[in-house]
Amino acid sequence: MRYLPVNAIEIPTTAGTPDAPFYQPLGNEEQLFQQAWQHGMPVLIKGPTGCGKTRFVQHMAHRLNLPLYTVACHDDLSAADLVGRHLIGAQGTWWQDGPLTRAVREGGICYLDEVVEARQDTAVVLHPLADDRRELFIERTGEALKAPPGFMLVVSYNPGYQNLLKGMKPSTRQRFVAMRFDYPPTAEEERIVANEAQVDAALAAQVVKLGQALRRLEQHDLEEVASTRLLIFTARMIRSGMTPRQACLACLAEPLSDDPQTVAALMDVVYVHFG
């Protein structure tokens, strides 16, 4: 392991080691994330489903040698779920830290996936952490935790899912350094599929070409297009011995739509590429 000194903060660089999560850089996102961490700035990642947002955060946590606490946000996720709560047991009552509090105490990364799904009261907790104060107030214990230099708050969401009822308020969004992700260009996506699915370049190219054809059908009754994740699933199934048509039905057509006619239309595209 080697260390790169950055303004008195040492960054342990572990990228490329056998257990490093694979990530294919597409631009300057690694440098931007690293500089944001160096300056104590939170990061907002927005992009469609399955484009690599979570894998990127895992990759950067490994690269920076930081503990990573990932929270999959949902409608019932409250501030108490993030901060912690009192529990009652045989030995009495005790306080249990939530994932956000643990990340602050340990100086790690707290990653809130699909943050707009969480309840509105979470913003009250996140705002002091996401501005110059970098503080977490635990109302139930009276603690005010000052985030150490290593702590970083990272959130993500899919802009395509936003509506009038669920969206990130400008007062929250403007506290973050924002990064926009999308599906990779052809050559990079082929490398990703080949690496993740452990298939040869020819099959990866064929699957990616199919995925791009399906993405052009976005306006045809599809809520979401074929993600890189689904292309990887498809390639893995084909590698394991499933026929291409069966793999594409199970890993692409059916996950993309519940409507039988739409599924049939998607399979027509599959037949063109895997006749």
Swiss-Prot record:
Location relative to the cell = Cytoplasm
Checking Gene3D superfamilies in the record gives: P-loop containing nucleotide triphosphate hydrolases (3.40.50.300)
**Protein name as it appears in the record:** Denitrification regulatory protein NirQ
| Upregulation | Under denitrifying conditions.
Sites binding ATP sit at 47-54, 107-114
Coiled-coil annotated spans: none
Q: Pfam families attached here?
A: AAA_5, CbbQ_C
The reply on keyword Metal-binding is no
GO molecular function term, any single one: DNA binding
Kindly report the protein's main subcellular placement as a broad class. Answer: cytoplasm
Any one annotated GO CC term: cytoplasm
Q: Which residues form the signal peptide?
A: none
Keyword ATP-binding part of the UniProt annotation: yes
Sorted keywords for this record are: Activator, ATP-binding, Cytoplasm, DNA-binding, Nucleotide-binding, Transcription, Transcription regulation
- DNA-binding residue intervals: 249-268
